[in-house]
């Protein structure tokens, strides 16, 4: 089963979570990693920031992505690193 079929067959995922997963999958490098900010994801998919955050949480909870915090040299946060599993 392809990743596309697997995502669409999973009834635990909302439409917004599927859209965000496809967005991340499309932007991931060869190792499955990408780092768009929530604001960028929301803008590109025409979602509210909160809806994008909920979709990311749903994907992490169901094991479709892994989310790791990233930090600048001064210790402030920047966009998360997402790994598409």
For every predicted segment, state its role.
Residues 1-66, 72-77:
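Short recognition helix of helix-turn-helix/winged-helix DNA-binding domains
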Residues 75-85:
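Intrinsically disordered, low-complexity basic tails/linkers immediately adjacent to helix-turn-helix/homeobox/MYB/SANT
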């Amino acid at each position: 089963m392809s990743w596309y079929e697997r995502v669409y067959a999973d009834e635990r995922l909302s439409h917004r979570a599927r859209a965000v997963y496809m967005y991340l999958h499309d932007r991931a490098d060869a190792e499955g990693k990408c780092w768009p900010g929530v604001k960028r994801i929301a803008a590109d998919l025409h979602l509210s920031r909160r809806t994008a955050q909920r979709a990311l949480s749903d994907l992490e909870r169901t094991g479709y992505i892994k989310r790791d915090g990233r930090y600048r040299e001064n210790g402030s946060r920047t966009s998360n690193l997402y790994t598409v599993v």
